[in-house]
Amino acid sequence: MLVIKELKIDGIGGINSLKLNFNEGLNLICGPNGVGKTTILESIGHMFSNGSRSKVKRNVKFDQGSCEISYSTFLDTIHTQSCILRNYEENDSLDWHGGNANLAKEVIVFKAQRSFTYTQLDSLRKDTETSDGKFLDDSMNGIQFFDFKNWFIHRFLFSHVDNELTTVQKENFKLATDCFGILDNSIRFSSVKSDTFDIIISTSNGEIYFEYLSSGFKSCIYIIHGLIKEIEYRFKNDGGIKVQDYEGLILIDELDLHLHPQWQAKMIYLIKHILPKAQIIATTHSPHMVQAAAINELIALGIDEDADVYVRQLPNVQYGFQGWTVEEILEDVMGLDETRSPMYIEAITEFEKSLDEENEEKIFEAYYKLDLMLHPSNPLRKLLKLQVAQFGRVIE
């Protein structure tokens, strides 16, 4: 078990000074580009590396950067771990790194680059070997997906052989097959080709290799199926655990990556359903994910006029942002200055100016421009028509 309680960052990346508190379940970090969302995840991940290399950089305005986390384990006692960073070049080591890096086994990291292409398997290999060194490396660089296909086909073949898979392995494999269709019920696992070792997926357009799914679907598979595979490998020598019983830490950068808005909210429910006991710290740019999260699961960041990153105060409401529009979330939660296009703002400004000046020619010119822009059911259309009608012209 591993739960991050608190994070303090000073002088790392674009962050001058920041303190964050996390809950034991989902923590969804949102905010504008450059606010430091990825830096937060990188800083946490680096705390469970060996410190020999660093992908985080000190803030150029500081002589050194520092990071400290407070966390709890099975014994429910609070521990602290910290590092100091003075270097600025790529892959320089941390100047000082203290704490229990052996906890890296409990940390699973997903970077923003989550794609994969077709892999040809000429034969099946044994399960990928794990080691403390690999856990430390993965905490900084993120887990790999190249061995998922071998894992899945291995479990598929031996699931048909008595007493070859444990009960835990069978349940995890069933979860893996079910998850192909959990975002879209028109997609499901079909079979494995015996002559080529290919995973076949049934879709509404026919059967395809699983590597031929859309980028969004593959990004989801990378996370969900990568988690199942990784948890099995990491805890195999401990008797194995079901994915739903994993109580470690999961870091996911850009959880909404490549996902259609229809799937973004589903992804929140899915990951909480599959990992009810894990702590998940993820970043997002998606207002649809913000809508789907509970209010205590959100960490909204902003940047003030002094370029300092701060945590936005969110309303403590029972239903979170489930009743808010996307535009309201973008502006009031995620810090977007304007949700309308510059062309629209120019057109509506010109229309209002022409009304004030009672310039009929420009009024009608601006009106027709807005008429071509607005959504057919936009209620503003009716108001614009009423305003134009004051000048003796009826618009059908």
UniProtKB/Swiss-Prot annotation:
The keyword Kinase does not apply. Component of antiviral defense system Septu type I, composed of PtuA and PtuB. Expression of Septu type I in B.subtilis (strain BEST7003) confers resistance to phages SBSphiC and SBSphiJ. May be an ATPase. It comes from the Bacteria. Keywords: Antiviral defense, Hydrolase. InterPro entries: AAA+_ATPase (IPR003593), ATPase_AAA_core (IPR003959), Bact_Antivir_Def_Nuclease (IPR051396), P-loop_NTPase (IPR027417). Pfam families: AAA_21. One of its GO terms (biological process) is defense response to virus. GO terms for molecular function: ATP binding; ATP hydrolysis activity. It comes from Bacillus thuringiensis. This is Septu protein PtuA.
